[in-house]
Amino acid sequence: KYGYGRSLSGMVYAARRMGICMADSKAKPPRKHDRRYPELLRPGEKVQIDVKEVPYSCLKGAVKQDGKRLYQWTAIDEFSRYRFVYGFEEHTPENSVKFLKLLEAAFPFKIEAVQTDNGTEFTYRYISEEKECPFETALREAGIEHRLIPPRTPWHNGKVERSHRNDQRYFYDWERFGDVDELNHKLREHLEWSNRKPMRTLGGKSPMQRLHEALAV
């Protein structure tokens, strides 16, 4: 107590560095969202979709001068981590429908279910009991199940959220865009790289390798 000027946490840290095992004074409670989900067995069983607003610092030229914004739609197959991304100028349900059509053409497998948050680009669940969101109409017509995560629980869409953080780190921190065409041109190159990047969660394989192995069975 007397003659020691460091905090308890500092003392514990120093003891661990010297190889002295000390129990924590208080065990950390488990996080509420530390839970396991059912293992997926095939590509397309569940696809997470979300939208990322392109950072304002990445805009240049007319798109910035006119006060416009750009948005990245992202889909990630939970089984293989294989992704598809596309940029739009407006954050609307109609663009979600356009993205779905592009996604169906891009993914070489049948999409059985998609999982999204409760944003109005995906659902009118909390604003209208009578009017159906165009995105949900498109899903129903395509025979794709729509799963909605509980409100304010982004960790339920954790795979697409993490992929957006990687996009920020490896893409948006380095790129600038004058319009949506330039965004999509550069996104195509980034997508090719990210789908070929080895991942620890896939045992050192890339999403493309994981997908090809699954489709070859």
Name each model feature, range by range.
Residues 82-86, 147-149, 173:
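Short small-residue beta-strand/loop micro-motif enriched in glycine and branched aliphatics
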